[in-house]
Amino acid sequence: MAEQIGGQIFIDTWGLVNPGAPQRAADYGQTAASVSHDGNGVYGARFMCAAIAKAFETSDIDEIVDAGLRELPEVCTYRSVMEAVRAFHKAHPENWRDCMELLFRDWGYDKYPGVCHIIPNAGVCMMALLYGEGKFDRTVEIATMAGWDTDCNAGNVGTILGVATGIAGIPRKYLDPINDAIVCSGISGYLNILDIPSFCREAALLGYRIAGEEAPQDLKKAYRPGEVYFDFELPGSTHNIRLSDPFRCRA
């Protein structure tokens, strides 16, 4: 349990609320992951949170990866698999499938206990980041096509690239079907169905609070706890509104 993938798959928000502060993001991620994980399970949380936080400052994948690696111990299996994938990419940058063969051979599920160990999937995340070449869609697609824990790996690298490229870098083929929906997994069910703009504003306010900075007034006014408030101010926002009878609801 301690080193299964759960340590890095539910901590993206700690990177989002610590923009430009990789070390602080990693510390928050470690605290969250340590509730149920340890060792490499926690190191994965540190890497992902730091990478997301760094992506607010740069879209350069090497800089983002370096920020994540700086938050790992010098000697640990998590660092080893990430560096192995990076070295392979440097020598063979043409085809991610060749790198996947490396992961199957040296870092596969057969090497680790449990049903979904973090190490093989960490390798997939690094592979997708490098071979995706800074493109949101290609990065997510590689993480998915690689197999293993497809949704978790695509989610982690998708968060990193989503921050790095901004909404302009996310193709309509992803934006339109999702339609600003976000589904959480909290204990209180009524809090689990959200829309992305509302989530973004709440995360932004929390980020200002963590940083000890005053949030802009327009952001404060746009977030109204306990209310349903849609202003469509964020670019491309739909607030997950769906029409049941589009024939009668033409624009």
Q: Where are the predicted features?
A:
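Accessory "access/gating" subregions that flank catalytic or transport cores
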Residues: 11, 15-21, 30-35, 49-147
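Catalytic cores of secreted or luminal carbohydrate-active enzymes
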Residues: 186-251
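Acidic catalytic motifs of isoprenoid enzymes
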Residues: 1-3
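Hydrophobic, membrane-interfacing alpha helices
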Residues: 5-7, 41-43, 47
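A glycine-rich phosphate-binding loop feature that marks nucleotide/adenosyl-phosphate handling sites
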Residues: 47, 68-71, 85-86, 160, ...
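Catalytic phosphate/nucleotide-handling subdomain of diverse soluble enzymes
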Residues: 37, 48, 125-205
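Short, conserved phosphate-binding/catalytic loop or strand-edge motifs used
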Residues: 24-32, 45-46, 177-180
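Long, charge-rich low-complexity segments
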Residues: 61-64, 93-101, 168-172, 201-217
